[in-house]
Amino acid sequence: MDTVTLDSIDLKILRALQEDAEIPIAELAEQVGLSQTPCWRRVKRLSEAGVITKRVAIVDPQALGLRLTAFIAVRTNQHNERWLERFARGVAAMPNVLEFHRMSGETDYLLRVVARDMEHFDSIYKQLIEIADLNDVSSHFSMEQIKDTTVLPVEDAAGLKPRRGVR
């Protein structure tokens, strides 16, 4: 994997693509002050280096009837690799789990889940507790989503340490 040094133009490209991944290359090039070919090459280089990992459509969960968002805090007495592999495999197979984090502090794992309603959530919850031996599972329901973004603060990139071939 090639090493990439991010400069101010790369950061402008990343900012623009995070806002609209379908932006035409001509428009992107104009926004960042490049001609089309050098802009396209930079986007390609950022993709090949793993800085841009994928381009996706962001779908409104409400439009799909997924009106309930819950955060599930999991505690376990099991902290061995075999247990984690089993638990991670089971959670990864659950399409309603959008995020899955190993945590520090009192909670061992935190999951963000979407569901149609409480009955649907309960079926997801029951599926989760069957995966592995869990000590404590508590659910917290979102009353209102105040901020939702996938846009990373590229302005902070100068403070990042090298990752995946990027410095």
Residue positions per predicted region:
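A compositional/biophysical signature of low hydrophobicity enriched in polar/charged and small residues
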Residues: 1-167
